């Protein structure tokens, strides 16, 4: 199947159901190199499920996910690991040190043994994310925010062409949220990586993403550049009247009050223990 997009990632007519319960339907979009896309929508709308379909953790019931023109279902797991960096919303803890946990991201690239090149890449990622002082600590001894940084560092050392991040700043304070997303945007811009992040905070998403994908009832309601998001779109999806202003060149969503003409949309339940 040929792609309708000149994209690193192309999602075409994707459908996913858990047992007989539809979660996603007719999802179409593409992400190009050097673009950061924010997937937005209410709780339970299917954002995490979509990321897991892209990463071949879940197999769609219909449609396809193409990575540079190839179906992800045709790729071996080792190849996916070198081409897609995935940061889950909740990272597992273990008795790895921070250094070893980040080094695990290099494993898909290692042929015989870990070399100096791999160690330098890990050192650079630890410095970029402010983790050097924690590198000998066990990851079950660090905070949730620090654990999110470790997960991002591990994804970055994979040197992927596509980054998938599920609520990458959910456990971070405001200062660290800004620092991490500034770094993420810089990596995408400077290295030509395609990035996708799911977000609940609209203002943070609009501040750092190039484009948005707004989901409602498991389908694409609207997509475009962040400056194209309108108050009517937000009201329809979230059931909340808002004004959107430009401050410092960035769109800012200002909630007004709940719109009784747009009640909060119903959720699509996502699989237990397989999605958040």
What are these regions (language model features)?
Residues 103, 116-134:
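Conserved ABC ATPase "signature" region
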Residues 163-167:
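Catalytic Walker B motif of ABC-type/P-loop ATPase nucleotide-binding domains
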